[in-house]
Each structure stands twice: as C-alpha cells, then as structure tokens.
A protein has these predicted regions:
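A short SAM/SAH-binding and catalytic strip from SAM-dependent methyltransferases
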Residues: 112-126
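Short alpha-helix
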Residues: 186-203, 209
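A short glycine-rich, Lys/Arg-flanked "PGG" loop and its adjoining helix->strand segment in the class I
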Residues: 129-141
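A C-terminal cap/extension of S-adenosyl-L-methionine-dependent methyltransferases
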Residues: 208-262
C-alpha cells in the first residue's frame, strides 16, 4: 500500500490530469466515450459510486446532471482539488478512500460503480481481485460497473517507438511475451483477453469492452496531427460506432470493461 501510494502520489502531485482530459483530443474522446456509456446504463437520478475519482472530472459533471454521486479518492492532493471545484454542489459526497477497502460502503448500495483509474496502478494479483470484488460487492444486483484499464500494446506503440523500443519490450513483457505487472510500474497495461479473464470467477456478466480513446494518442504524436472541431465531432461519431470492434481495441490507450452484477 505505502509503495503504491508513494509512486502514484508523486506522479499526480506534479501531473495535471484535468488538462489532459479537457485540452487534448485524446482526453476529450476518452471523456466523451466514458460519459456515453455511463448515460446508456444509468437511469436519471441513479446512485453512482466513483472509486478513484481523481479531481472530480466525472463525479462533478454527473452530480450536475442530477445523479446522486459518492466519489472516493485515495490521494488527499486530488481530494482537496475536488472539494474546491465542487463547493456548494449538491448531490456529491467526496471522501478519501481506497479501491482495496470500501468497508464504509454497504453491500449493494449503488446502482452503478465506476472504477476509472485504480486498475492502472494495481499490480499484485490479490489486490487486483480485491478491487474487483469490492466494486461488485457495493453494486446492487442488476447494477452496472465500468472498469477502465490500459492496453499494453497501446503503451508500447505510444511510448516506446522513440528510440527505446528494446527497453519497452523488457519493461512490459517476459521472455515468452507474457505481460508483466510489478510495483515499480507507474502504469500497468493489460492484454485485453487477460483483463476480461479477471472477471470470470465473479458474479457478473460482461456487457462489452470498448475503446475509450481509440488511436488518438498515437495519432496525436504526429507533427501534422490536426483535428479541428468539426472534424473531431465527425471522428467522435465514427469512434462511438466502432469502439467495440475487437480488431480496434488494442490500439486504444484507455479501455472500458463494462459488466452487470448478477
């Protein structure tokens, strides 16, 4: 716990996640896609729990839309920013909390549970299963859960084809190209089938796996990348029509595993 908290805390203390989501086409697409799937599965006024809510990009927007939102965040730095942004906003309760311990939350308390960040930073198989189990426990039977995760193949394409491809392979794969997960990784990526298999022993039914931002992180690295507003809106429509296609998932940096509790 302390090692994970130190690694993640140092990163988010100096990284402006809100700017990535709000000011980059990749972040905008990730946000639009995630909100699209939330709206598909959450009834108006539903009780939502966001675990690992960061500075509140989703939880504040959802509370403003009339949802009853509880937002849990591990890092006090992020929690304080969210308190400042949401001052006076009804329908939102922000608390410090860890995805591995939701003991303050009752069984089946929420219509929908959002886990949109913690799985990026969990490496130990026991902790991964604990986070999944806790999210399922606090969701009502028939309720929907969204788990965000990272594609290891997108990590390779986006971060290591810059003169350090050999290091990227050593960092993310074993000799047989099995995906590695270890505490020193700031972000851990998954093979998509590997992530989906994590849920096989839990009382849930998979609804879909969707690409949240598609190829936009890779594309935005091009010097000639340009996606004006009108072009972007067209790309959003294309993306939402194709983001569940299996052949396109691996290029997406961020993905959503969406399931329903039995």
């Amino acid at each position: 716990m302390h090692k994970r908290l130190d690694i993640v805390g140092r990163f988010y203390a100096q990284y402006d996640e809100d700017s990535r989501v709000e000011a980059t086409r990749q972040g905008q697409m990730e946000y639009r896609t995630t909100m699209e799937y939330i709206h598909r599965h959450a009834q108006p006024g539903a009780r939502l729990l966001e675990v690992g809510a960061g500075t509140g990009r989703y939880s504040i927007a959802l509370a403003r839309e009339g949802y009853d939102v509880t937002a849990l965040e591990l890092l006090e730095h992020n929690l304080e920013q969210r308190r400042q942004k949401s001052a006076g906003l009804s329908g939102l309760r922000a608390q410090q909390g860890d995805a591995l311990d939701l003991s303050r939350v009752e069984d089946g308390e929420f219509d929908m549970t959002l886990v949109l960040g913690p799985m990026y930073h969990l490496y130990d198989p026991i902790e991964v299963r604990t986070a999944i189990r806790e999210a399922i426990r606090v969701t009502k039977p028939g309720g929907v859960m969204l788990f965000a995760f990272l594609s290891v193949y997108a990590i390779m394409g986006n971060n290591y084809l810059k003169g350090n491809a050999r290091y990227g392979i050593q960092e993310n794969f074993g000799p047989d190209f099995r995906v590695l997960h270890f505490p020193e990784q700031l972000f851990t990526g998954y093979d998509i089938a590997e992530f989906e298999a994590l849920f096989e022993d839990f009382p849930v039914r998979q609804l879909t796996t969707a690409a949240a931002d598609g190829i936009l992180e890779l594309a935005s690295g091009r010097r000639d990348f340009d996606l004006p507003d009108e072009e972007f809106e067209g790309w959003v429509r294309y993306h939402l029509a194709t983001c569940e296609k299996r052949e396109l998932l691996g290029h997406s940096s961020h993905l959503l595993y969406i399931c329903r509790k039995n």
